[in-house]
């Protein structure tokens, strides 16, 4: 164990434990913060020469602990794969993130971001820098509110998409995708940041308008 791994592991545990102790969750907080510190320290992902690196570590260890804990679960799942997710140190080291070229994802051909970790990138650097990194920082800045808002929008959007399909019978999946995914403010933000809006994927009748270059995938 090198010095950085030890320092980030101990610091992460202290920070995670301290922030959740008032909620009676000091031990889980310390475990998540400490494990993230150990994994991230051993992979040297945080850029200590820039304020963003310190902010990333502090947020991952405190306000963003839910996303960080979920990311630890992703790391564990990646280790069960034969290729271990094809970890990309060249895209991770001192860049405040963990990047995998393959691995777990909720949709085929789509990258997936969980906390400070991106999987199934497939070498798409522009997608990483201009879309997935938006999600990494959304998880950090919105903290425990992020999964709540994202999940609530997804659920309500699925209901709205289903209702639209019942009314017009013009493609259930595309309607649900449009309302639950593409209209999700967090996804809309990332697509606009990437310059890929309007996407060609949403149901045209309900798609938001805007300037863009095409679709993400």
What residues fall within each predicted segment?
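Membrane-embedded multi-pass helical conduit in multi-pass membrane proteins
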Residues: 26-53
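Catalytic Zn2+-binding segment of zinc metalloproteases
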Residues: 133-152
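Charge-biased, low-complexity intrinsically disordered regions
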Residues: 1, 9-22
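Active-site scaffold of zinc-dependent metalloenzymes
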Residues: 96-126
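Short alpha-helical catalytic segment bearing the HExxH-like zincin motif
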Residues: 124-136
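Metalloprotease/metallohydrolase-associated module, dominated by Zn2+-dependent proteases
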Residues: 4-13, 51-83, 94-96, 100-108, ...
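Transmembrane helix interruption/hinge and helix-loop junction motifs
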Residues: 17-27, 142-143
């Amino acid at each position: 164990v090198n010095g950085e791994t030890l320092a980030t592991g101990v610091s992460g545990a202290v920070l995670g434990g301290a922030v959740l102790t008032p909620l009676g969750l000091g031990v889980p907080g310390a475990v998540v913060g400490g494990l993230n510190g150990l994994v991230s320290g051993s992979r040297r992902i945080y850029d200590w020469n820039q304020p963003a690196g310190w902010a990333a570590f502090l947020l991952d260890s405190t306000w963003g602990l839910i996303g960080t804990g979920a990311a630890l679960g992703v790391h564990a799942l990646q280790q069960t794969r034969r290729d271990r997710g094809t970890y990309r140190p060249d895209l991770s080291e001192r860049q405040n993130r963990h990047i995998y070229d393959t691995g777990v994802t909720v949709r085929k051909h789509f990258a997936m971001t969980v906390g400070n970790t991106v999987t199934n990138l497939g070498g798409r650097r522009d997608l990483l820098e201009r879309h997935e990194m938006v999600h990494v920082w959304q998880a950090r800045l919105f903290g425990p509110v992020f999964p709540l808002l994202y999940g609530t929008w997804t659920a309500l959007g699925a209901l709205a998409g289903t209702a639209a399909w019942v009314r017009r019978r013009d493609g259930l999946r595309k309607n649900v995708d449009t309302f639950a995914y593409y209209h999700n403010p967090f996804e809309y933000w990332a697509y606009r940041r990437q310059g890929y809006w309007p996407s060609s994927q949403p149901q045209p009748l309900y798609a938001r308008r805007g300037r863009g270059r095409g679709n993400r995938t």
